[in-house]
């Protein structure tokens, strides 16, 4: 027997952040790619190595070894060193999908990163507070690594 349920109201959630980095566009973009990939960590500092294939259609996934892992998304668009856009389910095990948008612009002090994460679809209420803090932790590592490389 097949049953259908009426669709509920579409849920959307958006996280935005602006990050000022005292490093060049190139250093900041390289730090972003590295820290979203092999240098990734959970907010508590636990290693969470990911693979980010930085080209259109490239995958962003957690490689657990032995052909096991978790697909987080695909590179939707990339224009080095000013744009990185990723689309996919990220860490959600629901029907939700996300769009991550990083726009980098040169400033007199270095680089400004404008970040937007838009999530559409069902997702647990208890995930909402952790979304912003997780991205903030990643962005702090990106800034620190880029600024260290700039010295």
Q: What do these predicted regions represent?
A:
Residues 1-16:
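Short acidic N-proximal helix/loop "leader" segments that mark the beginning
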Residues 17-19, 71-77, 89, 98-106:
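Hydrophobic/aromatic beta-strand elements that line small-molecule binding cavities or substrate pockets
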Residues 90-93, 116-122:
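Short, solvent-exposed aromatic-acidic interface loops
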Residues 119-151:
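A conserved amphipathic terminal alpha-helix motif
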Residues 16, 23, 34-71, 81-83:
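Short beta-edge strand/loop motif at the mouth of beta-sheet-based domains
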Residues 28-32, 60, 75, 86, ...:
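Hydrophobic pocket/interface hotspot
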Residues 67, 92-96:
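Short glycine/serine/proline-enriched coil/turn segments at secondary-structure junctions
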Residues 21-26, 76-82, 103-112:
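A short, structured loop/turn motif at beta-sheet edges
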């Amino acid at each position: 027997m097949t049953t259908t349920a009426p669709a509920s109201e579409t849920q959307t959630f958006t996280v935005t952040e602006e990050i000022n980095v005292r490093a060049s566009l190139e250093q900041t973009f390289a730090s972003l790619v590295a820290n979203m990939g092999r240098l990734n960590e959970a907010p508590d500092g636990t290693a969470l190595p990911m693979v980010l294939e930085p080209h259109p259609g490239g995958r962003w996934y957690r490689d657990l070894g032995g052909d096991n892992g978790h697909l987080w998304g695909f590179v939707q668009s990339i224009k080095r060193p000013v744009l990185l856009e990723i689309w996919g389910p990220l860490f959600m095990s629901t029907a939700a999908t996300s769009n991550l948008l990083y726009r980098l612009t040169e400033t007199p002090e270095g680089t400004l990163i404008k970040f937007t994460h838009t999530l559409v679809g069902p997702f647990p209420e208890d995930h909402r507070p952790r979304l912003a803090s997780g991205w903030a932790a990643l962005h702090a590592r990106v800034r620190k690594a880029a600024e260290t490389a700039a010295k």
